[in-house]
Amino acid sequence: MEEVAGMQPDIICLPELFDTMFVQEQKPLSEVAEDEKVPGIVTSRIAAFAKKNNCYIVCPLVTKKDGSFYNSCLLVDRKGTIAGVYHKKHPVKTEIFPDQAFKGGGVIPGAIDQPIIETDFGKVGMLICYDANWSEAWDNLKKKGAKIVFFPSAFPGGRMLNYYALKNNYYIVSSTGGDARVIDISGNDLDSTSNFVRYAWAAINLEKVNVTTWPTNGMLPDLFKKYGDRLGIKVWGNTEVITIESRDPQLKVLDVLKEFRIPTYEELLKNETEVQNKYRPESGKK
């Protein structure tokens, strides 16, 4: 974290169980877990760093609450306070069974419906590792309005993360013990780690949306003519998706779409689904 502090990040995401990975098999769960309400050794240091560097930190570790243990993510805000907690919904069974992944106990699954968290730059969600295999978990974060999903993990997640980013029109930031990525809403990597750099970093624009090439492609000349470089427009031919972003703080991308009557990717699919359902044989429509 000290290496990236000079970049003045708004938020840093650490890997799953970054403080105890492999240690939890030697030390009792009760010793490595930290209370969610009372700052422990790790959370105190993370909080101090966040406050000093004016940034948020996604801090994944084992927590204890009301006598139970969870594989968790704490979101520490710029003031060094805990802004929210996420409990891993789908832990591997070896995490649950006592004395397998964790010495002297096991964690329990988090609630299926958990709130997303408000930050000063937008709503964020969190999922952890094995959660990646349940697509409804990703869809639910979209329904709740998440703009960025943080994914601390023990495995990379691969192409499924790129798909979820495109499908749900949000950014995904993954962080593992082996690699890290920042994935654009188009489903393409903005940055990733390498053999030479151990962290991924990217500036992201939340004034950015996905639309489909049809019917938008016919409107591109007029968009360029009116707004020029105030808009960033990228056509992704292989998925027939166009990303449109505002490069002007005074220009809201949704206002531009409304002006040109361009539906977002989600709006188009919603409308198409409504028409399809209306005319299905079981709907009674003749």
Per-region residue spans from a language model:
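Cys-nucleophile CN-hydrolase/nitrilase-fold catalytic domain and related Cys-dependent amidase chemistry
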Residues: 2-79, 156, 167
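A short C-terminal boundary segment appended to hydrolase-like catalytic domains
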Residues: 209-286
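Alpha-helix-centered segments that form part of catalytic cores
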Residues: 39, 51-52, 107-115, 126, ...
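CN hydrolase (nitrilase-like) catalytic-core segments centered on the catalytic cysteine
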Residues: 35-56, 123, 132-236, 245
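Active-site-proximal beta-strand/loop segments in catalytic clefts of secreted hydrolases
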Residues: 15-17, 60-62, 89, 128-130, ...
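Short beta-strand scaffold segments in enzyme catalytic cores
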Residues: 60-61, 72-75, 115-117, 180-183, ...
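Active-site catalytic loop in hydrolytic enzyme cores
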Residues: 65-144, 159, 163, 167
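Ligand-binding pocket scaffold of soluble enzyme catalytic domains
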Residues: 4, 9, 83-87, 117-120, ...
